[in-house]
Amino acid sequence: VEIMISLIQFFSSSVLLKQEKTEQEIPDKKTINKEYWKVAFPAAIEGVLLNLMLLADLIMVGMLGIEKAAAVGIVSQPKMILQMIVSAAGVAITAIVARRKGEGDEEGLNSCIKQSLLLLGLLYFLFVCLSFIFSKNIVSFAGANEDYIEYASIYFQYIALSVFFKALCVVLSSAQIGVGNTKIVLISGMIGNALNVLLNYLLIFGKYGFPEMGIQGAAIATVIGNAVIFVILLYSVTKGDYGINILKKGSYHFTKKVLAPLQEIGTNSFLEHIFERIGLFIFARMIASLGTVAMGTHHYCILLWDLYYYFGVGMSSASASFTGRKLGEKRKDLAILYMRAAQYSGLWISIFVGIIFYLLKNSIFSLMISDERVILLGSSVMMIISLLIIPQTQAQVTAGVLRGAGDNRFIAIYSLFISAILRPYLAYIFAFIWKLGLVGIWIAFFSDEFLKMLLAQYRIQKGIWLQKKI
């Protein structure tokens, strides 16, 4: 009982609320939940749909044969590395734009968008040029062999161009998330990704009079899809909605007010991504050494886990948006209440999804594959995933609050300790010393998310994020 009371007190925000007393009007719980999900739901669904599009992409490319599939797979690593910088910058852009929106500083808000577009546009233009010149060297360094290096080199050149448009999309979508306009992010993503899947089908296989281009067609489809998303998002920031109008407000001249927080928050986020990548790289090596069945089963488990993971990413983005805006409005009490709403709703949703995963664990794998060994092992892993997503959701929401406040250095620190060091160490113990195999790997994943949840909540309870200036 004492342990339960201690846990309730640890996760309670009552102490923080008492410290932030206000005479201003406070919305009721129903209003807060409604407003939160108005922002969170489109962001969450956009992440899930993106993951489904990537899955469709993978299936169509896989039909071309192992060499073409390997070429696409080997390019995914340099592609992720290219995207890490703008992904980190996106966290900073959301935090800055949300804070300026809350402060009512539309000039500063639009300056952030314009300067970020200029800076990252120039940077990624340079990346594209270098990628075209050194494409074969890059994919060779990534591990491509002679069987498919030519395919991989050509594919990477197109993907580098798609990453350029993706980078610009991240700048604009991060800004829209910052002001709470996730609906346009969902709409643009749905249109662009649907077009991507359609063009994949037409260009990969040469349907309805289109040329049969194989993986080159898949890459071209990705470029066009991202370009369309960029055009839609670019139009959205010229209309004046939510205070965003880059045609009439803001400046392209670089200023300390934009670059200082962009550098600070972005660097911390970049380090977080680096530490996560290190941990995942070590994990991949461990899983590969467990054998083909374990590797294949893990791949299917990741695909299923990602569907919910990206839903949590949407909740995290919404939490960052509300935190930044409410702190900008000098309403720390509301920042706490929106965080509480996200945590509570996230808890019940994760429990509900966890129960579904647990009850349907055998059926899900039976639909995807007929190998009994994979079904048995996958069902065991799904039991862990059904529990894992509960602390994972809390960790995502709470980390989103810290990012929205600009207090994300702590996240980078615990990502180094947990993801890059502790998680691989625990995975080695569980999988190899205790001989639990792939199940041990996923127990380490659970430990990772549970510790992140505790440490993020510890930082929240310290209240430092409420005082953070951007």
Feature annotation, model-predicted:
Residues 38-57, 158, 192, 225-229, ...:
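Transmembrane helical elements of multi-pass membrane transporters/channels
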Residues 2-43, 97-164, 210-267, 323-388, ...:
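Short alpha-helical transmembrane segments in multi-pass integral membrane proteins
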Residues 50, 54-57, 61, 83-90, ...:
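Alpha-helical transmembrane segments and their lipid-water interface positions
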Residues 43, 47, 58-59, 76, ...:
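Transmembrane alpha-helix boundary and packing residues in multipass membrane permease domains
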Residues 90, 94, 159-177, 185-193, ...:
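Short runs within selected transmembrane alpha-helices of multi-pass transporters and secretion channels
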Residues 28-59, 63-64, 77-92, 96, ...:
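N-terminal transmembrane alpha-helices
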Residues 58, 69-129, 166-185, 297-359, ...:
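Small-residue-rich hydrophobic transmembrane alpha-helices
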Residues 52-70, 139-146, 202-213, 274-307, ...:
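Helix-terminus/linker motif at the lipid-water interface of multi-pass membrane proteins
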